[in-house]
């Protein structure tokens, strides 16, 4: 075991490849023992490692004069040490009310936004924070008690991407006691935040009542938790990679605001990959800004939702995210405004773009296409009244079906094809000038259509449905 605080931190930094020489480091300094000790450690290494140090401090304005005194303390300390100091005062309570989040999440968002800004300003490679080994123990315990994702159970990361560089925590290998001793040896008198002793917070209760018992069993318990954290992170990285690979085969459609997947294909995945797959979708749609009210319980709800016997249904998630099941497909997307009825003429030849970005393209030809799948409609040119009209469905719509006597309700065709209700309103209905429904793209052709087998030399009107979507990957 190393005798000194500095040597222990040196070993930890080297073991985990925390930071490189000749780098600019933004150090988050609250004025408390942890961040002040981190600052002094980095200053001790500054000359040898050719570090550029910038201190950043946020006054969250939670504690009135006390928090303002913290800011002044940091400014005075930096002046004494000859270090660049960037500070800001943010009314976090106002921000919290404005965006409807708890105080801790609001403070974190404001603080990290400021750190990112300072990182950009000085072209820094790292943001260093003062979390230590006891923090790691408390964090893992708290997440186990409250529930979290597998990534969350791994606790605090030593190093993770942040802006164009990394957020690092060099002190995770030492305890709070060692930090306090280091401050005493340097005759530093840091600021003390009284809220750290309030038992209203889960973390503080764990610190006061649980952590001492763990340290009685093993004084180096923080090292065991740190090892557990690293193993969890390594395992999680591997499972995330597998989940990416599998989900890219499960997803059937993808856009910026919506993802659809095949439920049978999804359920063929193992449960660990299913949970991570749902998390990947949520990360993508929320753009990695997951609402604080979202938890592992929501992921379990989605998995249970897929197992229900009912063929359709929906779930509402925070931030207006809606999850809609329609038979064997499920769509994740943000609630959209009601689709307005539409009507548009389509010339021949010509092209129109639909509201979803897909296109209908018409042509006149004496030859029929070699590929006569559901994306193509062919009729004799003179059998159709022009112009063609593309519209939304209407009550009572019917069409004569190729190879069938009489007519059939459009509604029945949608139901048989298991088209979700919300998609029916935006589905294009192709009519001729007399109002006859001649084609429901991708679903049914009318009696006006000809087949490849019955086609002879003639003049044909051909419509192609061209989708902008391919099988979507959730990896950008």
Curated annotation (Swiss-Prot):
Protein residues bound to ATP: 30-35
Compartments where found: Cytoplasm
Keyword NAD included in the entry's annotation: no
Keyword terms of this UniProt record: ATP-binding, Cytoplasm, Ligase, Nucleotide-binding, tRNA processing
Main location as per UniProt: cytoplasm
Protein's UniProt keywords contain tRNA processing: yes
Domain comment (free text): The N-terminal region contains the highly conserved SGGXDS motif, predicted to be a P-loop motif involved in ATP binding.
Record-given protein name: tRNA(Ile)-lysidine synthase
Organism: Bacillus cereus (strain ATCC 10987 / NRS 248)
The encoding gene: tilS
């Amino acid at each position: 075991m190393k005798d000194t605080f500095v040597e222990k931190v040196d070993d930890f930094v080297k073991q985990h490849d925390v930071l490189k020489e000749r780098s600019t480091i933004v150090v988050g300094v609250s004025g408390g023992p942890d961040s002040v000790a981190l600052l002094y450690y980095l200053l001790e290494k500054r000359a040898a490692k050719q570090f550029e140090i910038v201190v950043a401090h946020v006054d969250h304005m939670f504690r009135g004069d006390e928090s303002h005194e913290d800011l002044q303390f940091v400014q005075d300390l930096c002046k004494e040490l000859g270090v660049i100091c960037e500070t800001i005062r943010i009314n976090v309570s106002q921000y919290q009310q404005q965006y409807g989040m708890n105080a801790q999440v609001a403070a974190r968002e404001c603080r990290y936004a400021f750190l990112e800004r300072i990182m950009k300003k000085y072209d820094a490679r790292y943001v260093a924070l003062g979390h230590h080994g006891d923090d790691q123990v408390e964090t893992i315990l708290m997440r186990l008690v409250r529930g979290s994702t597998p990534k969350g159970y791994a606790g605090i990361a030593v190093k993770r991407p942040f802006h164009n560089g990394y957020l690092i925590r060099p002190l995770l290998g030492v305890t709070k006691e060692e930090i306090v001793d280091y401050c005493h040896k340097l005759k530093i008198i840091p600021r003390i935040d009284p809220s750290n002793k309030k038992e209203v917070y889960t973390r503080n209760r764990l610190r006061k009542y649980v952590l001492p018992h763990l340290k009685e069993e093993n004084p180096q318990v923080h090292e065991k938790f740190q090892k557990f954290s690293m193993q969890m992170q390594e395992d999680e990285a591997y499972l995330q990679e597998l989940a990416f690979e599998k989900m890219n085969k499960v997803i059937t459609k993808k856009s910026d605001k919506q993802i659809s997947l095949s439920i049978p294909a999804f359920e063929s995945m193992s449960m660990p990959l299913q949970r991570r797959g749902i998390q990947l979708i949520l990360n993508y749609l929320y753009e990695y800004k997951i609402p604080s009210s979202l938890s592992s319980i929501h992921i379990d709800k989605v998995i249970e939702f897929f197992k229900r016997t009912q063929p359709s249904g929906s779930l509402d998630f925070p931030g207006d995210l809606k999850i809609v099941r329609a038979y064997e497909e499920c769509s994740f997307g943000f609630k959209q405004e009601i689709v307005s009825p539409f009507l548009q003429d389509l010339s021949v030849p010509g092209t129109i773009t639909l509201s979803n970005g897909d296109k209908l393209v018409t042509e006149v030809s004496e030859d029929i296409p070699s590929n006569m799948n559901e994306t193509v409609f062919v009729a004799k040119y003179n059998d159709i009244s022009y112009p063609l009209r593309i519209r939304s469905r209407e009550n009572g719509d019917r069409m004569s079906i190729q190879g069938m006597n009489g007519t059939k309700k459009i509604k029945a065709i949608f139901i048989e094809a298991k088209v979700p209700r919300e998609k029916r309103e935006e589905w294009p209905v192709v009519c001729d000038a007399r109002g006859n429904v001649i084609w429901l793209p991708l679903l049914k052709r009318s009696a006006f259509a000809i087949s490849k087998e019955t086609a002879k030399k003639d003049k044909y009107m051909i419509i192609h449905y061209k989708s902008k979507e391919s099988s979507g990957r959730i990896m950008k």
